[in-house]
């Protein structure tokens, strides 16, 4: 509901960053008829192009069709890296056969290092961070993110100069404190068996879990 109501005639490309490596966003977009720009080109063995991710309008028809530009800086379960070659494939048999070569950043002590040294991961992160440039005028939606990733937290905190909407069941105290200090940050969250909203630096108790994206879409988009 949220995706179909957000991609509109006014903005044909919506930018999404996810630290998750599942394909839920891609599947939902397919069902909604929304194209997904991943930075990879090709059908069976997709190859990564930074310019395709950076300048999608040079390749895709972004005037007549709706698109999601998807940044996956921790990799994806359909990315394969083998013998120095990297490609994207949606062929289940290939993914099953090459399971040990699936390219994702798993939780652990080497997480930050891998994200810095892998070229595709680094490009994904750098291009998304560029979108967070404080000089640009836009609003930012953060959904279900726990602010536990050093790669993005600094850039996200800098972007808090803009209008920011945070939907997350669990929110760290320092994020809540920032919302109480800055009127441009709105937060919906759950704490101590209650639902809360922080809006224009004031905290309210509410009667429904608006941090849930479906509840949010039903309430504000319909």
Can you annotate each of these PLM segments?
Residues 1-11, 126-135:
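A short acidic-Thr-Gly-centered motif at the start of a beta-strand
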Residues 1, 104, 216-220:
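Generic hydrophobic, helix-prone segments enriched in Leu/Val/Ile
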Residues 2, 24-31, 72, 120-127, ...:
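Amphipathic alpha-helical segments that form well-ordered structural scaffolds
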Residues 6-106:
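Extended, H/D-rich, highly charged conserved domains that either
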Residues 114-116, 122, 126-222:
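SIR2/sirtuin-family catalytic core signature
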Residues 3, 61, 93, 102, ...:
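Compositionally biased, intrinsically disordered low-complexity regions enriched in proline and serine
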